[in-house]
């Protein structure tokens, strides 16, 4: 192929041939042609000398695609190799790019036709600026401003460059540049902003050219968030922006600028200017958009520009109110404009656009939190510091003053807050528990996939409704009951109206005092049950059923206190279990489980007016209740009844209830086992296998809820289960041995293996949930050593169940050192054979990988002495497998491997084998961890990489190591100590891995690691900066490097939510639910 000539870069590249190759890649040619072109272009990009041909290519091609290809090559060099280039090459490229931009933007015609190319050149120039400025290109900003004044089109493009520069430094810099470089660029932009400011004012005052004014407003928008406020409030800038606001061509860009100004907050120095700005803005807005206009309707029929205006308006109001609403509150003359602004925002909140609603919702959430916070601290001054993180001391004399101020504030906001309650009730998002939805064709169906965006929105709306309920319980109750009565009367009957209302009712669970909640719920449940009776049609009844189930599932406190309601609700759920409309039975079973888990004690005592506990009555009619349920629904039901039985404190009654619950499955089990004793072939029939599987799954769910009390039931079937396990295992093995790998995918083998897995899962579930009683371990573990472990070792790889590994991990985690003597047997049975399965590549046997390393971690944590007793060959295998684990790109496996490694490092440090272990493995571990830390595929493991390296760097100074880490036979000169050796070794290791970094930079980093070894925060920051400096992590999504900080913030938020009644739903709070 002629294009192969392009690989030869010893002479100027054939641009015509390059054009043809690039076009072949982008064209609709054959797949082979595109693949061939792709290979050549990739090789050219990878070749370190291609960039030297960029100028030649740009000067000789007319193809936009080829120009972009050349600029991509250049961009890579600028990002990763720029500082290694000779000064003359850097200056030459910098001047060439600048000249091309000026040439193309000087002429109106070329500027418009080549706009895409100019935009890409601008990006390249800004990448160069980030490297060169300010140290090596001090005159960049003055040069740009001078060029801007030579022609209006050049000025327009200069504005685009200035916008790009601000975005690169202030918006996209985190994770791409070191903290020091970001700081340097920000200081330079700040110090030279006066020139930019003067240029913008000059253009906005003097130019009549629409494109230039729009480009200037757009650039200004990028700068307003960080420039000193004096440039805004002590110059004509704000006045000019407000002058442009009524002009339709500039309205949206001006509004974006005003939103940026509104989002700034530097104390109260400019408060009066903010009030003046808001006042002028509101007067202008009411002329453009009358307050009585139906904004949602106007939005739905408006142009894209008009819709963008409403979106920007939402951003302006929310930004302004978040920071400056208190200024408007403080002066009576501003109150009417403040209420008008809130009125606009409530009207905008009804717009049928998810993004607009998210913006509004975020503000409403913060406003009601703030109103609730001030009210809460007025009523409970002693509690507030701990609730809201305020360090204040409240004197009795100040509390009354605060209370009266809060009362006035509540009066001011009472009307907007009442309207906001109406908004929230009418737009509540669907909670996760609701399984019944309306599809795009208007049919009521079972939900097939969760929408995470909707769940996040529900969480925020629920929190907002909780605060609104706390601010005025009566108004909340009144609005909800009024809307419910309109559902009953038919005045507002509609699926969506009932759904959002019931979701809102369910969401405020826990926010009312007990007496009010009781009164409220009695009316709600009665009305919903009445609605179910009067409304006809299967779809209608399904919608009402789902709402009844959702509401009752949220109010366990009410149900615990009202037995008759609880019994009525449960009987209603039993009724729904016979309703075959998609989703109703699933939701009925899920709701029953949720209620039982929170009210279980109520079902095992004899209630007033009853002759026996409810659980006994239920067990008598068990077959009828579950008669129409599918197997998976029956399993959920059985788990629920198991929860009830677990609450019974009398062992004799508990045993009797369990016997009655398991009577049907036990009867079927005994029948199958009895037949199998006559002829084992019965166990090979697919229908029998399915029945066995179903029985085992039922047992597993009951074991989940009963824990230790399941002992009598599992003892009854345990040995028979092991026999079934052995028989099915032999069938699977012989099928795979005779039929090859394909046999493992046949329906019969899949079914047999499902039974094996369920047996293992049942045993694991019971042992995990049972209390730590040694006699249980002694009863169940020995029979499994051959039947399960031996079977695993003997089987062909494709027939080995990964659940064996997790079962024995659970056993070791549960019984700890008691299992130490068994570890060699476990090791012998699973280690070597599993390792052979998972180390051929990173893909095969994914389940075995994770569970194998979880088992190793359990052994390392609780039976470490057993690891020490391994031979050096076996220990090497363990260490190799650990390294193999954290090299894995599957996050769970890599994290399990790193946690296991940390566990072993700490344990070996405390052991007698410390010196021997670290002499053998210290350098290998350090090398391997640095390899995964710096390769960008393992970023989620960043926190653990840091902890491993911190351990290693701390270890060399700790005194734990009495022997040298270097090999005296191969190292020509001895080191004074291990610290000196490790620092030098690490510097050499990283210098060879990152040739683009100087030895000084690497040495500085390594010394920084050593100096910060006792401060994990500084240690982590050093590594983050190094990763960015090394260029390996530039232009990547680096949020994983900050994951630990994000997790800590989430925990602080959870603690705050726990302190406010209702914010975490009662159904989500873990408690013992003794129901006394």
Swiss-Prot record:
Keyword Ligase part of the UniProt annotation: no
Positions annotated as HEAT repeat: 135-171, 232-267, 282-319, 475-514, 564-601, 613-650, 683-720, 757-794, 799-836, 895-935, 943-988
Membrane topology term: Peripheral membrane protein
Pfam families: CRM1_C (PF08767), CRM1_repeat (PF18777), CRM1_repeat_2 (PF18784), CRM1_repeat_3 (PF18787), IBN_N (PF03810), Xpo1 (PF08389)
Source organism, top-level taxon: Eukaryota
Keywords: Developmental protein, Membrane, mRNA transport, Nuclear pore complex, Nucleus, Protein transport, Repeat, Translocation, Transport
All residue ranges annotated as the Importin N-terminal domain in the record: 37-103
Localization per Swiss-Prot or TrEMBL: Nucleus, Nuclear pore complex; Nucleus membrane
Signal peptide from the UniProt entry: none
PROSITE patterns with a match to the protein in the record: IMPORTIN_B_NT
An MF annotation (GO) of this entry: small GTPase binding
A GO BP entry: embryo sac development
Loss of function: phenotype: Gametophyte defective when both XPO1A and XPO1B are disrupted. Abnormal pollen germination and tube growth, impaired female gametophyte development and embryo lethal.
A cellular-component GO term for this protein: nuclear membrane
Tissue and organ expression note: Present in mature pollen grains, unpollinated pistils, and 2-week-old seedlings.
Annotated coiled-coil segments of the chain: none
Broad class of where this protein is predominantly found: nucleus
SMART domains xref list: CRM1_C, IBN_N
Family annotation (SUPFAM superfamilies): ARM repeat
Similarity comment text for this entry: Belongs to the exportin family.
Record's protein name: Protein EXPORTIN 1B
Native source organism of the sequence: Arabidopsis thaliana (Mouse-ear cress)
Phylogenetic classification of the source organism: Eukaryota, Viridiplantae, Streptophyta, Embryophyta, Tracheophyta
């Amino acid at each position: 192929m002629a294009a192969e000539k392009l690989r030869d870069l010893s002479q100027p590249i054939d641009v015509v041939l390059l054009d043809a190759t690039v076009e072949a890649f982008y064209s609709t040619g054959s797949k082979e042609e595109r693949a061939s072109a792709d290979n050549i272009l990739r090789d050219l990009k990878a070749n370190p000398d291609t960039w030297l041909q960029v100028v030649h290519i740009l000067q000789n091609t007319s193809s936009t695609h080829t120009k972009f290809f050349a600029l991509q090559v250049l961009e890579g060099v600028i990002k990763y190799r720029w500082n290694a280039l000779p000064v003359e090459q850097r200056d030459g490229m910098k001047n060439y790019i600048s000249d091309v931009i000026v040439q193309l933007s000087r002429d109106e015609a070329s500027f418009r036709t080549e706009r895409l190319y100019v935009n890409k050149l601008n990006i390249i120039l800004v990448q160069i600026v980030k490297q060169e400025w300010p140290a090596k290109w001090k005159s960049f900003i003055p040069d740009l401003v001078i060029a801007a004044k030579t022609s209006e089109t050049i000025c327009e493009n200069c504005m685009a460059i200035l916008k790009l520069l601000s975005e690169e430094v202030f918006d996209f810099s985190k994770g791409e540049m070191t903290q020091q470089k970001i700081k340097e660029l920000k200081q330079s932009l700040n110090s030279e902003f006066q020139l930019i400011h003067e240029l913008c004012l000059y253009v906005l005052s003097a130019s009549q050219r629409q494109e230039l004014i729009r480009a200037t407003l757009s650039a200004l928008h990028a700068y307003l968030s960080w420039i000193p406020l004096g440039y805004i409030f002590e110059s004509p800038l704000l006045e000019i922006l407000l002058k442009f606001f009524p002009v339709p061509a500039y309205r949206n860009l001006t509004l974006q600028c005003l939103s940026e100004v509104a989002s700034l907050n530097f104390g109260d120095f400019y408060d009066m200017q903010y009030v003046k700005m808001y006042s002028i803005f509101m007067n202008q807005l009411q002329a453009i958009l009358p307050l009585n206009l139906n904004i949602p309707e106007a939005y739905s029929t408006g142009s894209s520009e008009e819709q963008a205006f409403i979106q920007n308006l939402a951003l302006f109001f929310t930004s302004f109110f978040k920071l400056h609403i208190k200024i408007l509150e403080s002066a009576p003359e501003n109150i009417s404009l403040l209420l008008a602004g809130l009125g606009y925002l409530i009207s905008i909140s009804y717009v049928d656009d998810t993004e607009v609603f998210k913006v509004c919702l975020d503000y409403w959430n913060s406003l009601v939190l703030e109103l609730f916070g001030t009210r809460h601290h007025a009523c409970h001054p002693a509690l507030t510091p701990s609730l809201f993180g305020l360090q204040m001391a409240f004197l009795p004399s100040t509390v009354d003053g605060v209370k009266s101020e809060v009362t006035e504030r509540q009066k001011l906001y009472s009307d907007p807050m009442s309207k906001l309650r109406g908004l929230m009730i009418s737009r509540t998002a669907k909670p996760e528990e609701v399984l019944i939805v309306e599809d795009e064709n208007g049919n009521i169906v079972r939900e097939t996939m969760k929408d995470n965006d909707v769940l996040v929105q529900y969480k925020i709306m629920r929190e907002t409704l909780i605060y609104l309920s706390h601010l005025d319980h009566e108004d909340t109750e009144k609005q909800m009951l009024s809307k419910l009565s309109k559902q009953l009367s038919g005045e507002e009957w509609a699926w969506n109206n009932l759904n959002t209302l019931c979701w809102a009712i369910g969401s405020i669970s826990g926010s009312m005092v007990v007496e009010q909640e009781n009164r409220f719920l009695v009316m709600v449940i009665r009305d919903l049950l009445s609605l179910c009776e009067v409304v006809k049609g299967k779809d209608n009844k399904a919608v009402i059923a789902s709402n009844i189930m959702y509401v009752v599932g949220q109010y366990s406190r009410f149900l615990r206190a009202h037995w008759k309601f609880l019994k009525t609700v449960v009987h209603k759920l039993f009724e729904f279990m016979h309703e075959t409309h998609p989703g109703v039975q699933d939701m009925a079973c899920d709701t029953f489980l949720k209620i039982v888990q929170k009210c279980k004690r109520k079902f095992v005592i004899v209630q007033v007016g009853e002759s026996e506990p409810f659980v006994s009555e239920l067990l008598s009619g068990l077959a009828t209740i579950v008669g129409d349920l599918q197997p998976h629904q029956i399993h959920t039901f059985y788990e629920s009844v198991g929860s009830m039985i677990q609450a019974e404190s009398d062992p004799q009654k508990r045993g009797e209830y369990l016997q009655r619950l398991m009577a049907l499955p036990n009867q079927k089990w005994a029948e199958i086992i009895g037949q199998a004793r006559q002829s084992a072939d019965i166990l090979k029939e697919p229908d029998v296998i399915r029945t066995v599987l179903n029985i085992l799954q039922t047992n597993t769910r009951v074991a989940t809820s009963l824990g230790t009390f399941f002992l009598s039931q599992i003892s009854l079937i345990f040995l028979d289960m092991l026999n079934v396990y052995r028989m099915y295992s032999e069938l699977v093995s012989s099928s795979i041995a005779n039929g090859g790998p394909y046999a493992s995918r046949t329906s019969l083998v899949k079914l047999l293996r499902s039974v094996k897995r369920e047996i293992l899962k049942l045993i694991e579930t019971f042992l995990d949930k049972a209390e730590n009683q040694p006699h249980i371990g002694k009863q169940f573990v020995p029979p499994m050593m051959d039947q399960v472990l031996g079977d695993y070792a003997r089987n062909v790889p494709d027939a080995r169940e990964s659940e064996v590994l997790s079962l024995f991990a659970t056993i070791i985690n549960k019984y700890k050192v008691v299992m130490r003597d068994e570890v060699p047997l476990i090791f012998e049975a699973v280690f070597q054979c599993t390792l052979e399965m998972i180390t051929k590549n990173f893909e095969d046997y994914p389940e075995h990988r994770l569970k194998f390393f979880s088992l190793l971690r359990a052994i390392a944590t609780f039976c470490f002495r057993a690891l020490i007793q391994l031979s050096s060959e076996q220990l090497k295998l363990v260490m190799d497998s650990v390294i193999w684990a954290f090299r894995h790109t599957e996050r769970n496996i890599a994290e399990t491997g790193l946690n296991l490694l940390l566990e072993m490092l700490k344990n070996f440090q405390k052991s007698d084998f410390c010196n021997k272990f670290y002499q053998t493995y210290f350098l290998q571990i350090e090398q391997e961890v640095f390899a995964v830390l710096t390769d960008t595929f393992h970023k989620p493991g960043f926190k653990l990489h840091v902890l491993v390296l911190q351990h290693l760097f701390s270890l060399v100074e700790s005194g734990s190591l009495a022997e040298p880490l270097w090999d005296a036979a191969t190292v020509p000169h001895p080191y004074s100590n291990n610290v000196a050796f490790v620092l030098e070794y690490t510097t050499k290791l990283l210098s060879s891995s990152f040739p683009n970094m100087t030895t000084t930079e690497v040495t500085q980093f390594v010394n920084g690691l050593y100096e910060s070894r006792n401060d994990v925060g500084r240690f982590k920051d050093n590594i983050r900066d190094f990763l960015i400096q090394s260029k390996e992590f530039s232009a990547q999504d680096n949020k994983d490097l900050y994951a630990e900080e994000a997790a800590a913030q989430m925990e602080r938020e959870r603690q705050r939510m726990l302190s406010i009644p209702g914010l975490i739903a009662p159904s989500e709070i873990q408690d013992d639910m003794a129901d006394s």
